[in-house]
Amino acid sequence: YPTAKIFFFTRWNCKNFKGSDSEKVVDAMIEVCGNYSIPIFDCARKGSIYADNDTFRRIYFQKSKNNTDTAHLNSKGHDRFLKVAESFLLQY
């Protein structure tokens, strides 16, 4: 697919994100994608998905033991993020 485009999306934020290894990974992804001119969306800071919030996770994330899943959106979560992701993708 020589004309296909590639995009990256970072992980969501998490509890104690600021200064964490998770933040370092997000920043590294942004830096590497920038070096190769690959569009990347910073979901941790701009995604409007609040994985660090217990109430938010109960509503927008898949059910998990002790409500600890911070990665997998449910259908409501996907509906919420769709507008944000679509807006990013349509820039390209």
What are these regions (language model features)?
Residues 8-11:
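A cross-domain feature marking catalytic cores of carbohydrate-active enzymes
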Residues 13-92:
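Catalytic His-Asp segment of secreted/periplasmic serine-dependent ester chemistry enzymes
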Residues 1-6:
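A short helix->loop->beta-strand "cap" motif at the edges of active sites that frequently abuts
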